[in-house]
Amino acid sequence: MRKFLSLIAITFLMMSCSEDVKFNDPGLQGLKNDSFWRAADVRAYVTDGKLTIEAYAQYEVLTLGTSSTNLGKYKLGSTNSSNFASYATTFDDVAIEYATIPTPGPVSTVSLTNVGTGYTDATSVATTGGSGSGLSVNIKANANGGVTEVTLLSRGNGYMAGDIVTITGGNLNSKFRVVNVQNSNGEIEITQFDNVKMTISGKFKFNAVNSNNNPLSADVVNFQSGEFYNVQIYPSI
């Protein structure tokens, strides 16, 4: 009988834990530095077509922004300041702020801007240009000698979002743009926008750097597996 009661107690505890992590409707939650984080209140605003989501927990504010409400993915930490994430906490009058702002670092994501000519498939290809050094890539080229795919091999350091980098070899004319760097990157994905009920849903993940240079805070805050669901869009204020 005691074993049976213990089994019931364990089952009830497991159900309670499962219920605790079930997604709120509406709600916003994710993993902050590998620990579960959930907003106590969340709301969204649209101003001039740009989306802002504000999520509040005790002493904490998480803000997500995208350049539109269109479905799709929005890269963070790039030169497009309309796509951003920020996190702030204030406790005992000590303010700590993080943001996905352009900052020097190892390259995270690139976008090919010029395929160039004279290239062939190659590995460990050096690069030139940009703010940093040490960046090398693997490349694939088409029959005309144009680069069609760039894969990061060594991410280097000291690069900035927006840097234009040249791939060596070929006719030295294939280039790509640094979209963002590892310590300030991520994406927001809008998966659903209901313009009748005025609600929005999606996912997010990002690294954000210490933006107010507070020596008491870590250099980077990380959010992973983030989701927002049926967040109400309120009139802009």
Cite the ranges covered by each PLM segment.
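A short, compositionally biased
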Residues: 19-26, 45-50, 119-123, 160-161
